[in-house]
Amino acid sequence: MTSWYIKASSAWKQVNQAFVKSSSAWKEIQEGYIKVGGAWKSFYVAFVATGFTTQTSTGTVTVPDGANAIHVQAAVGGGSGGVGGADYDKAGGESAGAGGASGAYVSDEVYSVTEGETLTLTIGAGGAGTGSGYNVTASNGGNTVLSGSTTGAIFTLAGGTGGSGTGGGVQGPLRSNSPSVGGSATINATPLTSGSFRESDGTSVTFNTATTLDQGPVGTFNQSGNGTAGTNPGNCSGDNCQISGGVGGSSYAGNVAGGTAGGPPGSAAGGAGSRGSGAGGGGAQVPGAFSTSGGAGGAGEIKFRFLRIN
């Protein structure tokens, strides 16, 4: 972007917003030109919203000149894995695996940042599921974190905690099945909720009139919250009873489904999560097999763009 500087108190300062008085009213300047060698050259363009970037692996980004805010359309911690089912030899029952939990989330929140600072985006991995077994624990999802070299911590979205099945044996006792736990959201920065900015096409909008501030997964501006636990069917009663695995916890306040339950019916393993949702758990006494494995949790993400809020 073209930059324009003025000298103020012996120091050069970059111009981020400029106005001209026209017919007794102040109008914001959108573009400025200067004639150089007989040709008009651009020396100023008002800052407009950048395009969205989706970060799916840990990295850094520099806040561009002129920007003073980041719009996080979607961010979520990693979902936890699903627990595999367990089958027994005349122990009086069978065990289903708990579904994984989703990570905490942010949907359409705007935070202040400083131009030129480095933002670190840490993306939480999805947790691994387990095979079938009598003492197994699904892996947790990783934390998704946004922080700035000047701004400091902006948010930490904890990943889901995996469930478990413990204390069982092939001829009994039946194992104890513990549920997964949704990740917790820690919002360190205060979200911005008012002001005006320019969309990428140059249109001037306010927070109330913008149509791009509620297009995240939740569909409502300024939302954040904790993740959701998967279901935990537990044990069924009777030798060779059939039981389906748990369903993974949905992410983004129920707007992204969790992984599907492992069979029966059918002999599929627990389904994988997506976009921070929990994985499905495995079932027991499925057709053609004894029990099935849990799936992998959905990885985290941060989808963002930069704005200049006035």
Language-model features, listed with the residues they occupy:
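Aromatic-lined ligand-binding clefts that engage carbohydrates, nucleic acids, or primary amines
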Residues: I70-V72
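A short, compositionally biased
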Residues: M1-T2, Q14-V15, K27-Q30, V136-V145, ...
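Acidic, glycine-rich loop-and-strand cores that form catalytic or ligand-binding grooves
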Residues: T151-A153, A158-A269
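Disulfide-bonded cysteine-rich modules in secreted/extracellular proteins
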Residues: W4, V20, F47-Q55, V170-G183, ...
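Glycine-rich strand-loop-strand elements at beta-sheet edges
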Residues: T54-T60, A74-S147, G163-S178, C236, ...
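Surface-exposed ligand/attachment interfaces on beta-rich extracellular proteins
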Residues: F52-A67, V145, S149-T150, G183-I187
